[in-house]
Amino acid sequence: MAVIATMNESKDVMGIAVLGACVMFLVQVAHVVTSVIVKRGWCIAGSVFGIAVSLFVSLCSVVALAAGQYRPPVNANGAVEPTELVAGDSVTFSFAGSDVTSDIVAMVPEKNVRRAVSEWLDESLGGTFDGDKEDMGAIVGYYGNMYVDTLNSISSQGVPDYAELSYYARMDKIYETDKVVTYGLTIDIDMGGAHPLSKELGATFSKADGKRLAWDMVSKDGTTGVKNLVKGTLKDYFNVKSDAELMKCLQGVKNANSIPLPKTPPYMTEEGFVIIYQQYEISAYAAGMPGDTIPYKTMKPYLIDEVLKLTEK
């Protein structure tokens, strides 16, 4: 799979570049000394020129790498140029500074769903990108830089020495049929708090029109049935039998019959629909991200006809 790299800045890489230039410099100095000994003037002139080139390369390496952040290419009018991408490629942003790291990787979708998937990626990463929603390179570069700036701001305020300020996001295709495609998105954030935060997201898109599946996939008469399925899924996750035991595992829920559906809509995989709650959404951080996969045959009685057709293989 091709990888389109945006920018990778790291002190290790910078050190290697400078070290290489220094080695070039020392080689040229040695050449000058040797030339003086054997009295070859043309060699001296050439080596002096080589020294100048070495110093110039070293300076350029430091300046270029110190710049650090990816900025999408712009045209003469200052507008961002669209990035030429091929479905299946990965767009990568990578920044590694002394206190901050930011890495975002996103697989480029097929053209027929690219805009819909890109809009979902934008929403999931922050929802503030106002450029071309089909330009995955611009989206990834924008959020990569945004989180570098955010983490640098936090770092400047002072954080414990053990804190590792970082942002990581990766989007991949995880399921596909002739009717739908599902993308999964993993996000890990460490802003120097008591513990890092994570998200496990997914979204299924119709190949026919790019429509993203949402909770409206459930029929009006099927809502109660789906809520009961979700409650059963939570009992399995927490390994409890009764409603009373389940309530001890949840937070912000009044009773076991009013458990809210996850904010993240179900998404399709090979085994069925994935139901997942994010950290802190319904339980303590230590509980992780409660959820599981509900088989298609179990969900089908509660789905609208449009979605039922999408589940057929």
Please report, for each region that a protein language model flagged, where it lies by residue.
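Alpha-helical membrane-anchoring segments
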Residues: 1, 12-19, 41-52
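Membrane-embedded alpha-helical segments of integral membrane proteins
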Residues: 2-30
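Compositionally biased intrinsically disordered regions enriched in Thr/Gly
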Residues: 4, 62-313
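N-terminal regions of proteins, emphasizing targeting and processing segments when present
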Residues: 7, 17, 36-37, 48, ...
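Transmembrane helix-loop junctions in multipass membrane proteins, especially transporters and channels
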Residues: 7-10, 36-43, 66-69
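Membrane-cytosol interface at the C-terminal ends of transmembrane alpha helices
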Residues: 23-46
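Internal/C-terminal transmembrane anchor helices
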Residues: 43-68
